[in-house]
């Protein structure tokens, strides 16, 4: 499968506080082999800087239209440059990359748990689970109401519960508070977000539920060659970009 692609930007719009959605025409990408939880590594050219590509998870993959959608936050120099890109601009990407969420054996009921910029990859996963007959419940955590995005997209998958840190919408606190409050029924948990959130879910459910956690780490090459994104697991150090970003519940040791 070809990994380097020049994709045409179709849309690049602000959808929430410091949060953008970008649509990309991906004629050369093999959508059949694209797994939920995969990411693309984006090259941003601006006088030769920044040097490193930016890893961004895939929010939505439309095989029929050959369109990829990503959601990103304006958090630094590289992503700020991305906000200036316009429809018709060409974006060089490496991908799809990483080991995504397994969906061969789908559960009867799934719980999707996302925090902040960890929310986007769960949507493509939820679509595929729903289409296979799984009951999907989503718990999404944001800093505040102004930071919320794509709620209607997730509502097409099933029940959605929201937490905000300041209590401006939904449950005040974190996703773990919303889970405790609503107590959704599920067989398998799928989550992506800050490591502190993933650890809390790991501690709560390992040995009790099946689950998969997608980790966010700083990356360089995106293909496992540079060893810049190592993570501790019970089987030793692993590369988030290649062996992950998705790991089984209980696999990461958080050392």
Residue ranges and their predicted role:
Residues 2-87:
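Ferredoxin-reductase
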Residues 121, 216-245:
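Local cysteine-cluster metal-coordination motifs and their immediate loop/turn environment
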